[in-house]
């Protein structure tokens, strides 16, 4: 039986802190590789393996695995979109956003998380008003990155009132996020300058974030991945 299910469970231990146990990424890697071995032409198995490589920071393995997953089923809009998101966050913004554009064309009624990379593309280039336009399209109030993204943008724009509301919403979903900000952002953005840029926006928004990258203990929080 393909091991995509266990792979997702193990990844969520790492991504969102559900039932955390030791070495979630190593367990995810073994399960994902077994899934690919059992189902070598399955795009979901290949995509699961690509995700594991991404979160392990092995971009050399991530890119070919991600490309293969899309090639095996180029019409699965969710897989194309998630691959685009991870590709963009891995630093290949043009390629990643191209995949997001294709995914949106495949599914005109796509979920709001498709807009995160578009918002951060404008954010990283200092186009904060455009970033805000895209971030507002996410419309996922129960997902903590929605409020984290808005807070960073509002912070950069100097819109104090909206920034504080976003911080309050963020902390309701993820108490203590400030002490975990470095760690959480580094799970997604592979480039240190991007992580620092987002931290800068969050600090301007009023969130207290330590100078060092502390690995404090936190429980599960509300969200997806």
Q: Model-predicted segments: where are they?
A:
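Carboxylate/His-rich catalytic cores and anion/metal-binding grooves
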Residues: 4, 9-12
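Alpha-helical protein-protein interaction modules
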Residues: 11-12, 22, 28-36, 42-54, ...
């Amino acid at each position: 039986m393909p091991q995509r299910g266990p792979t997702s469970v193990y990844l969520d231990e790492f991504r969102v802190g559900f039932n955390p146990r030791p070495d979630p990424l190593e367990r995810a890697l073994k399960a994902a590789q077994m899934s690919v071995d059992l189902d070598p032409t399955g795009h979901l198995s290949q995509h699961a393996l690509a995700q594991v490589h991404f979160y392990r920071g092995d971009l050399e393995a991530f890119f070919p695995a991600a490309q293969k997953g899309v090639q095996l089923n180029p019409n699965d809009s969710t897989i194309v979109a998630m691959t685009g998101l991870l590709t963009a966050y891995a630093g290949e913004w043009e390629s990643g956003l191209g995949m997001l554009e294709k995914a949106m064309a495949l599914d005109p009624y796509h979920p709001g998380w498709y807009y995160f990379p578009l918002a951060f593309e404008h954010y990283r280039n200092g186009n904060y008003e455009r970033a805000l336009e895209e971030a507002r399209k996410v419309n996922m109030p129960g997902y903590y990155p929605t409020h984290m993204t808005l807070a960073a943008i509002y912070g950069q724009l100097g819109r104090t009132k909206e920034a504080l509301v976003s911080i309050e919403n963020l902390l309701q979903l993820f108490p203590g996020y400030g002490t975990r900000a470095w760690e959480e952002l580094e799970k997604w953005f592979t480039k240190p300058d991007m992580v620092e840029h987002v931290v800068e926006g969050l600090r301007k928004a009023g969130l207290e974030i330590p100078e060092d990258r502390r690995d404090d203990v936190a429980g599960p929080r509300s969200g997806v991945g």
